[in-house]
Amino acid sequence: MALKRRKRASATDLYRTCKQSGTCPPDVVPKVEGDTLADRILKWASLGVFFGGLGIGTGSGTGGRTGYVPIGTRPPTVVDIGPVSRPPVVIDPVGAADPSIVTLVEESSVIEAGATVPTFSGSGGFNVTSSSTTTPAVLDITPSGGSVQVSSTSFINPLFTEPSIIEPPQAGDLAGHVISSTPTAGSHSFEEIPMHTFATSEGPGSSTPLPGIRRLARPRLNLYSKANQQIKVANPTFMSDPASLITYDNPIFDPEETIIFEHPSIYTPPDPDFLDIVSLHRPALTSRQGTVRFSRLGQRATLRTRSGRRIGARVHFYHDISPIPSDAVELQPLVPSSSPSITYDIYADPEVLDLPAQHTQPTLTVQGPSLSAASASTKVHNVTVPLATGLDTPVTSGPDVDFAHAPAPVPAVPYVPATHPHSIYIQGSDFYLLPAYVFFPKRRKRVPYSFSDGFVAAW
């Protein structure tokens, strides 16, 4: 079996490990240190040939430090920009006779402002003189005479004035008394829009309200889901005191809230339908199958794991409060009923006609379909109508009328045509077997049949 040749490590990896111990292969050290035969030829050739700044050799091929320069041009020079020099600050020379204290404010003359303090001479004090006037001071503001004419002019610019407050200035006299005024000028060009109150949030109706989004969306209760066990409770105590059906004690609870029960390990509830119930959710009123239904969702704790987790099914307990009867609507016929159905006798009744015995005919009653469309509740009446035949009609001849032949009586039976529009088969079938295939062996497939058409008649 041929062994697979392993690839040797790179020269760089071998050089790192074998350089210190001196066990490197003969081709590793010259390759890493650049001392191969090709490198030596380039070194020897560079001594006699100068390639300038082209960088031809074992370099990176970037054209040297200055890069590649077109023929006939010079490489660009780099101008070094030094720091910007600041102008010198002139410093005043300080001599030995100058003071060492520098004054911040120059000397100036002192200016005194303010009123002078009065000086009093003598010791007599002040003389106070008091006087009183009994006549009130009344000023007459009414003009002495002459009529006052007041005129006003207003210029309204709708571009700078709001339409709802366009009012002319009120006219008044010089004394301030109003003479005339107008309430408004022109008609208002605005529309009153009634304000609507948006939906406001109401306080929660219970101590454990649902979150905001779920409360507004009104989620479905899913009482009749396949995951819920349906149990009907016939005891009406389920609506007022459901805890009495689960435990014997009487805990203080709110019937509108969720009830949580703590049971011992072994116990028997008063109602066996509420076995292993640990919680009853808030009640709900629904209408289903024509009744008002009181429902509560319960949670069972049938199993309990070692970690303390309880496992059980959800149960829907419901109690039907009262039925909802359907409204009875009396239906009226759309088409008014006409005359009742009447059955007529074709031949006359001898008792009604009171004819001689030799001309009496046997009475034939033909009950056909009703002559009018009536409702099913209409009462059927049988009425005999006297109809005379040709024998009952007296025929006499006179000077002006000649009855050579008596008129033929109207037949009682409807006229039936002698020919029929459809074909009638008497003791026949709807197809015939071709006689040529009678003596052939029977086959289940490919047996031609010829129907009773022109082909059979011609054959």
Curated annotation (Swiss-Prot):
Keywords noted in UniProt: Capsid protein, Cytoplasmic inwards viral transport, Disulfide bond, DNA-binding, Host endosome, Host Golgi apparatus, Host nucleus, Host-virus interaction, Late protein, Microtubular inwards viral transport, Phosphoprotein, Viral penetration into host nucleus, Virion, Virus entry into host cell
GO molecular function, one term: structural molecule activity
Any one GO CC term of the record: host cell Golgi apparatus
Primary site of residence: virion
Motif annotated as Nuclear localization signal, chain positions: 1-9, 439-447
GO annotation terms (biological process): microtubule-dependent intracellular transport of viral material towards nucleus; symbiont entry into host cell; viral penetration into host nucleus
Database matches in InterPro entries: Late_L2
Places the protein is found: Virion; Host nucleus; Host early endosome; Host Golgi apparatus
Family assignment from sequence similarity: Belongs to the papillomaviridae L2 protein family.
Assembly notes: Interacts with major capsid protein L1. Interacts with E2; this interaction inhibits E2 transcriptional activity but not the DNA replication function E2. Interacts with host GADD45GIP1. Interacts with host HSPA8; this interaction is required for L2 nuclear translocation. Interacts with host importins KPNB2 and KPNB3. Forms a complex with importin alpha2-beta1 heterodimers via interaction with the importin alpha2 adapter. Interacts with host DYNLT1; this interaction is essential for virus intracellular transport during entry.
Protein name: Minor capsid protein L2
Origin species: Human papillomavirus type 61
